[in-house]
A protein has these predicted regions:
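Catalytic cores of extracellular degradative/oxidative enzymes
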Residues: 1-52
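C-terminal functional module detector
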Residues: 39-43, 47-53, 58-217
Length: 217
């Protein structure tokens, strides 16, 4: 509940004191267009200089309708050993945008040596996307998006039985830009998941350094 200031009688236009936002909900798993429409709102935050982490979750209330883990958020942590999970490190990594959202494929992005959540200097940089998926999953495109615009894309069919797909591109990065990777397919993953669900995944950004503060709404 927002408290209205006594003197002005006006509440702030927006609350931006949060670290993450849900972009991909299990209810939208059958509609990539619905996910992309929410991504556009996220892009607006990024364009304004707010480094808000994108997340996804299955929103499972009933196992017979919503499979747990579709989609899910992968967060980079120091160790894959669950017994060594450091909750503080996990939370800090999520706050620093070191996360991937996916309903199937696992996609990573690097710009030179920078990883998801890192920052790079402006200039001509090499971006590299790697996508991993099981043999039965359709991965029909891999794409690089720079500040909301597609700047590189490859489309399938990829080699049958292939487990990985790669995309490289040279990007002219300007101050304040951000870059993400997207991968997905058109064939639904039935019967392993409920009918109508295609694979879709995207990364959080790699940011381009800028000497400016976020836009004040």
């Amino acid at each position: 509940r927002e408290r209205i200031p006594d003197l002005t009688g006006r509440a702030p236009w927006a609350r931006l004191d949060f670290d993450a936002i849900e972009i991909f909900n299990g209810d939208d798993a059958v509609s990539v267009a619905a996910v992309e429409s929410v991504m556009k709102d996220w892009y607006a935050f990024l364009d304004a200089g707010y480094r808000i982490t994108a997340t996804g979750n299955s929103d499972s209330h009933r196992a017979i309708f919503h499979e747990p883990g579709l989609p899910r958020t992968y967060v980079k942590v120091p160790s894959d050993d669950v017994s060594k999970l450091d909750q503080r490190a996990f939370i800090e990594s999520l706050r620093k945008n070191r996360a991937i959202v996916s309903s199937g494929p696992f996609v990573t992005l690097r710009i030179d040596e920078a990883f998801i959540g890192d920052s790079v200097a402006p200039g001509l940089r090499r971006a590299r996307v790697e996508v991993s998926a099981p043999r039965w999953m359709d991965i029909s495109f891999v794409e690089i998006v720079q500040k909301g615009k597609s700047v590189a894309r490859i489309e399938a069919p990829f080699e049958p039985m292939a487990l990985t797909a790669e995309l490289e591109a040279m990007l002219d990065l300007r101050p304040g830009d951000w870059v993400i990777a997207i991968a997905g397919g058109t064939k639904e993953m039935d019967p392993l998941y409920r009918r109508g669900v295609p694979p879709y995944a995207f990364t959080n950004p790699i940011f381009v350094e800028a000497d400016r503060r976020p836009v004040n709404p």
